[in-house]
Amino acid sequence: MSAMLNENVPVEFQEAHGYAAREKVVLRMRGRSWTVRLKHTKGRRPRRERAVLRYGWHRFCADNGLAVGDTCFFRALRSAGSGAGDVDDGDGDHVLSVTVHKADGGDPLE
């Protein structure tokens, strides 16, 4: 499980969703929610910060039985408490719906 303590957020995704200004995201899967803190580090390119899912990511992995080789798919949803839809309006917590495809070929976890 130690290999799964951090998860890098692709630069394109973090720029599209304003992660430079965010401190946390909420992951939703199987009717449950996990708050995960973002750690920001300077990237190798000038003015390109990197966001990493840190504190809370390990709990998400453990609670869902994730293993090395499993693939997580994230879909950005509207901020928590702002109604239905697929657009983040910048208010409140940024919510990501998660689907996991297990490396062993089992049914996806949603």
Swiss-Prot record:
Q: Name one GO cellular component term.
A: nucleus
Q: InterPro entries recorded for this chain?
A: B3_DNA-bd, DNA-bd_pseudobarrel_sf, REM_fam
Q: Where in the cell is it found?
A: Nucleus
Q: Which PANTHER family match?
A: B3 DOMAIN-CONTAINING PROTEIN OS03G0212300, B3 DOMAIN-CONTAINING PROTEIN REM-LIKE 3-RELATED
Single GO term (MF): DNA binding
Task: Give TM segment ranges.
Answer: none
Q: Which domain of life is it from?
A: Eukaryota
A matching Pfam family = B3
Give the Gene3D superfamilies listed for this entry.
Answer: DNA-binding pseudobarrel domain (2.40.330.10)
Q: What is this protein called?
A: B3 domain-containing protein LOC_Os02g10420
Q: Where DNA binds (residue ranges)? A: 1-104
Q: What is its main location?
A: nucleus
Record PROSITE patterns: B3 (PS50863)
Q: Which UniProt keywords apply?
A: DNA-binding, Nucleus, Transcription, Transcription regulation
